[in-house]
């Protein structure tokens, strides 16, 4: 499948009706031991943790959206990464969307983030704390040139390279999605230490943030992991294919109906949503 077709599918997956989904009616985590259920784009979570809003190492954006819930492993990853960044004097980590209290489908903006194992992290590390008003209406910093072929040199900082590398080297991280131009710059800057680049995957948009995904926890028996990324650093022909012009004659795919929920997620909805 060519890149244009994939882009259209991704857009359709994330641009669903803005009407509230049943999952948004669940306002608190479902009690129980933490269990991520299903796949990243069709699942839910029992026993989600709430990311503490107050931290000296990170700040949470758009708290009015209440998307700061996730598996305990995700909360610990955010705390671990932000502590590393702070100890290195790099700045404050800005946390975007995680998931809803019970996971599940959003009414727009995300196709994944459903099992409590995904988090968006802005690719900027401010030295001064954001105000409450700034956190509610954050300003994204677009690091990619208008033609999409490279990063903006005046905006690309060594600290951003280090932030992505630190996240990729974490034991629980399985994938990090960034814009192809950002992946290309990481490949140029990486030097001889390149093993971590395998986890960094090029994807549409993601010009101002990275989307970090954790592996399924060992005790979440109903969680469906993705296959591992292909071997290698991903800096060769695969990456360059993202910069090729779309093939002529690409047609817009039909909008697909969401697949049935995993039985455990459907049972959760039946029990907790009237």
UniProtKB/Swiss-Prot annotation:
Cofactors named for this entry: Zn(2+)
InterPro entries the record matches: Hedgehog_sig/DD-Pept_Zn-bd_sf, Peptidase_M74
GO molecular function, one term: metal ion binding
Pfam family, one: Peptidase_M74
Domain of life according to the entry: Bacteria
Annotated localization: Periplasm
Co-factor note (free text): Binds 2 Zn(2+) ions per subunit. Zn(2+) ion 1 is bound in the active site. Zn(2+) ion 2 is bound at the dimer interface by residues from both subunits.
Known role: Murein endopeptidase that cleaves the D-alanyl-meso-2,6-diamino-pimelyl amide bond that connects peptidoglycan strands. Likely plays a role in the removal of murein from the sacculus.
Name of the featured protein: Penicillin-insensitive murein endopeptidase
């Amino acid at each position: 499948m060519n890149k244009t077709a994939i882009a259209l599918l991704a857009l359709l997956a994330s641009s669903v009706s803005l009407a509230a989904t049943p999952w948004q009616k669940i306002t608190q985590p479902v009690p129980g031991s933490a269990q991520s259920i299903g796949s990243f784009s069709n699942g839910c979570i029992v026993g989600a943790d709430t990311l503490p809003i107050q931290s000296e190492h990170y700040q949470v954006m758009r708290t009015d959206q209440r998307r700061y819930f996730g598996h305990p492993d995700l909360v610990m990853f955010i705390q671990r990464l932000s502590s590393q960044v702070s100890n290195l004097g790099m700045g404050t980590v800005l946390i975007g969307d995680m998931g809803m209290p019970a996971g599940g489908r959003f009414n727009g903006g995300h196709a994944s983030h459903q099992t409590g194992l995904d988090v968006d992290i802005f690719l900027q590390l401010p030295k001064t704390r954001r105000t409450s008003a700034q956190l509610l209406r954050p300003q994204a910093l677009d690091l990619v040139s208008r033609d999409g072929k490279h990063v903006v040199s005046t905006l690309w900082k060594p600290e951003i390279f280090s932030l992505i590398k630190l996240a990729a080297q974490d034991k629980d991280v399985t994938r990090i999605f960034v814009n192809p131009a950002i992946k290309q710059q990481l490949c140029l800057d990486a030097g001889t230490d390149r093993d971590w680049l395998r986890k960094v995957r090029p994807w549409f948009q993601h010009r101002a943030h990275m989307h970090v995904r954790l592996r399924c926890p060992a005790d979440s028996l109903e969680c469906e992991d993705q296959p591992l990324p292909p071997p290698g650093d991903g800096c060769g022909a695969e990456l360059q294919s993202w910069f090729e012009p779309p093939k002529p004659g690409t047609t817009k795919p039909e909008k697909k109906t969401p697949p049935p929920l995993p039985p455990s997620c459907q049972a959760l909805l039946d029990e907790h949503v009237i």
